[in-house]
Regions:
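N-terminal secretory signal peptides that target proteins for export/translocation
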Residues: 1-12
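Bacterial N-terminal signal peptides
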Residues: 15-27
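N-terminal signal peptide c-region/cleavage motif recognized by signal peptidases
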Residues: 29-31
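Electrostatic cytochrome c docking/interface patches
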Residues: 35-67
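The canonical Cys-X-X-Cys-His
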Residues: 68-80, 136
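Short cysteine/histidine-rich zinc-coordinating motifs and their immediately flanking basic loops
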Residues: 85-92
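Short microdomains enriched in Cys/His and/or Lys/Arg
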Residues: 94-110
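C-terminal capping alpha-helices of c-type cytochrome domains
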Residues: 113-145
Length: 145
C-alpha cells in the first residue's frame, strides 16, 4: 500500500513538478529585454512615420547639439552614450542609451515615448519629430562595442 501511494504521489507530483521546471527553464532562456519592441522595430516605426530612413550622421549631430539651449542629449547620456550617464540637474544615474551596451534600451514602447517626450522638451522645448527620433536611433544602433 505504501508503495502504491508513493507511486500515485509521484504521478500526481510529477506533472506539477514538470510544469514548474519547464516554466523555470523557459524563464531562463528569455532575452534580457522584457518589453514589447526592439530598437530595430522602433527605428522602422519612426522611419516609416517620417517617410525617410534614419540617418546616423544626422542623429549624431542632433544628439550632441545644444539646439540653442543649455543642454544636449549628450549632457546627460554622455558622448558617446555607451556608458552610464548622469542627469545634468538631478545627478540621477542613467543607463547606457546605445542598444549594444544596454539590452533593455528601446525595448518598451510606452517607456520610449514617455522619455523622448520629456527629454525632447528639456533639450528642445518641444517634442522631437519622428525624423529626429529615427536619426538619433540610427546613430545609437550604429554604436558597437
Amino acid at each position: 500500500m505504501t508503495k502504491l501511494l508513493a507511486t500515485r504521489s509521484a504521478r500526481i507530483i510529477h506533472p506539477s513538478l514538470a510544469l514548474l521546471l519547464g516554466a523555470a527553464a523557459a524563464t531562463l532562456t528569455l532575452p534580457a529585454m522584457a518589453g514589447d519592441t526592439s530598437a530595430a522595430q522602433q527605428l522602422e516605426r519612426w522611419s516609416a512615420q517620417a517617410g525617410t530612413p534614419g540617418n546616423a550622421e544626422q542623429g549624431r549631430d542632433f544628439f550632441n547639439a545644444r539646439h540653442g539651449g543649455e543642454w544636449s542629449c549628450s549632457s546627460c547620456h554622455g558622448n558617446p552614450p555607451v556608458k552610464s550617464g548622469e542627469h545634468a540637474s538631478t545627478g540621477k544615474d542613467i543607463a547606457p542609451l546605445a542598444p549594444a551596451f544596454n539590452a533593455r534600451a528601446f525595448s518598451d514602447t510606452a517607456h520610449i515615448d514617455k522619455w523622448f517626450r520629456r527629454n525632447c522638451n528639456d533639450v528642445l522645448e518641444r517634442e522631437c519629430s519622428t525624423a529626429e527620433k529615427a536619426n538619433v536611433l540610427a546613430y545609437l544602433i550604429g554604436l558597437k562595442p
